Amino acid sequence: MEFPKALIKRPNYHFEYPHKRKDKRIGRGFSIGELEKAGLNINNARKLGIIVDIRRKSVHEENVEVLKKFLEQLSNQKS
């Protein structure tokens, strides 16, 4: 099973062309708010192998959905 990756917004730089810029990039890990919305805490997430970025404060709904799907897959495997 592949572990989920967090997506975050890329910073805007004035020297980049808009057509070369991507809207999202792969982040360092999931924020604490995203974990809480998905029903996890930091210790349980780290035991499951999910990387946690404690510095990030933003909560992206796409990441919450990815975490929920990952937890469903884990529960289906245990059954």
Swiss-Prot record:
Keywords: Ribonucleoprotein, Ribosomal protein
InterPro entries: Ribosomal_eL13
Assigned protein family: Belongs to the eukaryotic ribosomal protein eL13 family.
Matches recorded under HAMAP family: Ribosomal_eL13
Organism: Saccharolobus islandicus (strain M.14.25 / Kamchatka #1)
NCBIfam families (UniProt xref): PRK12277.1
Source domain of life: Archaea
Gene: rpl13e
GO BP terms: translation
High-level lineage: Archaea, Thermoproteota, Thermoprotei, Sulfolobales, Sulfolobaceae
GO molecular function list: structural constituent of ribosome
Gene Ontology CC terms: ribonucleoprotein complex; ribosome
Name recorded for this polypeptide: Large ribosomal subunit protein eL13
